[in-house]
A protein has these predicted regions:
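Short, surface-exposed binding/anchoring microloops in extracellular/periplasmic proteins
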Residues: 30-70
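Hydrophobic residues positioned within well-ordered beta-strands of beta-sheet architectures
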Residues: 37, 51, 66-68, 94-96, ...
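Short, aromatic- and glycine-rich surface loops/edge beta-strands on solvent-exposed regions
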Residues: 104-117
Length: 134
């Protein structure tokens, strides 16, 4: 049943995200464990930053974990405003919202790790960054 809801949610999620600012990364042959990664950050009314990371592993049985941070650049360095973690088998979609202040550059900083199964052997890990000014 969970997979049915994922399949129903994916087209809707993609349509919404296409209207926002995103960065897509497709797998190379030597990018073990990953098939596709999308990361995005957009700003809504009243300063709501909507940010997300989606990981599609190269096999649907693989488990992926996303560690995602929203950071603001000020004083010459990046400051973490909020962070969280989400893990799932097959497609892993993790989105958050956080209110921010205008006049800064923000970034989504996500580390994605792919495992053979939940609690299983690590296959690969990579970091993805997307910046946007508000």
């Amino acid at each position: 049943m969970k997979n049915f809801y994922k399949l129903l949610f994916i087209p809707i999620f993609c349509l919404v995200m296409l209207s926002n600012t995103t960065s897509t990364v497709s797998a190379a042959n030597n990018w073990a464990g990953f098939q596709h990664v999308t990361i995005g950050l957009s700003f809504k009314k009243w300063g709501l930053a909507s940010f997300y990371t989606t990981v599609i592993p190269s096999k649907s049985s693989y488990y992926s974990k996303i560690n995602m941070k929203l950071q603001r650049y000020s004083g010459g360095k990046w400051h973490t405003l909020t962070s969280g973690t989400n893990g799932d088998t097959s497609i892993n979609m993790y989105s958050r919202g956080y209110y921010v202040t205008k006049g800064y550059t923000y970034r989504v900083y996500s580390t994605a790790t792919v495992y053979k199964s939940k609690g299983g052997k690590k296959i690969n890990s990579d970091t993805f960054i997307y910046k946007n000014k508000y």
